[in-house]
Amino acid sequence: MFTGIVEDIGIVQKIEKENENVHFTLSCSFTKELKIDQSVAHNGCCLTVVHIDGDQYTVTAIKETMVKTNLGDWKEGAKVNLERCMTLGGRLDGHIVQGHVDATAICVEVEDQGGSWKYTFEYSGDDVTVEKG
């Protein structure tokens, strides 16, 4: 579970395809604090740490993740919003979110409302809150 509050900006260092899976190697300020099998939200998508090497770590996205998210658009050098999972007893500064992405949307309008912004999105598909979980 995550709060939805971005903790750091990571950099995609390497992208490797293996059959239908894609391995992403990233660097960020908290890499040395990560552990294998830990969940990290990447642009809101929950991915599991599978390898750590110095100041870089690797996560793997399966075919369904690649289809339902924008991870397929990532390039080496891309900046990625990161958040480590919540801990029991920690502060909840945002909202409880899963990090399980079911679809992507297109931003069709951005409106300046004098100090805040209104975003309007369109998406296709069923009106399903959580398809799988």
Q: What does each model-identified segment do?
A:
Residues 1-133:
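Conserved loop->alpha-helix
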